[in-house]
């Protein structure tokens, strides 16, 4: 669905968690859709498109990653996001806001411990962003352990 010029500013929290699972559920309240468009073997980057939709998306497929170095996020609307990374311990590392439609951000993620032989999956949770409440690291750790649908806000 193409973004319209009259699209309102969207605030999101994007949480990245490293899992060995095959699919993930998104919150019912989310009016965004994320999908991987391609894996660039040259830069070892994953390209993700974040597009506004009129209907809530309930799930999407995961992308296999190996020796991931950076993540390129294509923003089709005003995005307010944080990203988290880690395997056993989740760390909050970046908070960024875009005011440019169609802007592309390359975010380095230090996954140097991942070898190309490993079959890993990057799980992406999309949550409605409340500027006064960011999910705590403890909540994210519990979410990662239980592999539940994100419903933190």
From Swiss-Prot:
What parts of the sequence cross the membrane? Answer: 1-21, 106-126
The protein's topology relative to the membrane is: Multi-pass membrane protein
- Look up the domain of life of the source: Eukaryota
Q: Where does this one sit in the cell?
A: Membrane
Entry's Gene Ontology cellular component terms: membrane
Q: Keywords of this protein's UniProt record, alphabetized?
A: Membrane, Transmembrane, Transmembrane helix
Remarks, miscellaneous: Partially overlaps YGR294W.
Protein name stated in the entry:
Putative uncharacterized protein YGR293C
Q: Which organism is it from?
A: Saccharomyces cerevisiae (strain ATCC 204508 / S288c) (Baker's yeast)
């Amino acid at each position: 669905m193409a973004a319209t010029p009259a699209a309102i500013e969207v605030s999101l929290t994007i949480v990245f968690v490293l899992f060995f699972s095959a699919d993930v559920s998104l919150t019912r309240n989310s009016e965004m859709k994320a999908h991987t468009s391609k894996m660039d073997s040259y830069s070892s980057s994953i390209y993700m498109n974040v597009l506004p939709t009129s209907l809530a998306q309930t799930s999407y497929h995961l992308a296999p990653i190996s020796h991931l170095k950076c993540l390129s996020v294509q923003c089709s609307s005003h995005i307010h996001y944080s990203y988290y990374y880690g395997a056993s311990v989740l760390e909050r590392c970046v908070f960024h806001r875009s005011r440019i439609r169609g802007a592309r951000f390359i975010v380095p993620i230090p996954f140097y411990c991942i070898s190309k032989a490993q079959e890993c999956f990057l799980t992406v949770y999309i949550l409605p962003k409340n500027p006064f409440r960011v999910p705590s690291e403890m909540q994210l750790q519990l979410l990662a352990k239980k592999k539940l649908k994100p419903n933190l806000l």
